[in-house]
Amino acid sequence: MKTRPKKAGQQKKTESKAIDSLDKKLGGPNRPST
């Protein structure tokens, strides 16, 4: 059960990193709320 929240946090970090890369590709600071 302790590893569950850790995995969720890691997924969120990877998600924002991917969104960051998308932002740079689009050339704008508009981030999707998803």
Swiss-Prot record:
Record key words, sorted: Sporulation
Subcellular location(s) per record: Spore core
InterPro entries (alphabetical): SspM
Induction and repression of expression: Expression is sigma G-dependent.
Annotated Basic residues bias: 1-10
Regions of compositional bias (Basic and acidic residues) in chain numbering: 12-26
Transmembrane portions of the chain: none
DNA-binding as UniProt keyword: no
GO terms of biological process kind: sporulation resulting in formation of a cellular spore
Coiled-coil spans in chain: none
Residue segments, region Disordered: 1-34
NCBIfam families, alphabetized: spor_prot_SspM
Protein name as catalogued: Small, acid-soluble spore protein M
Source species: Bacillus subtilis (strain 168)
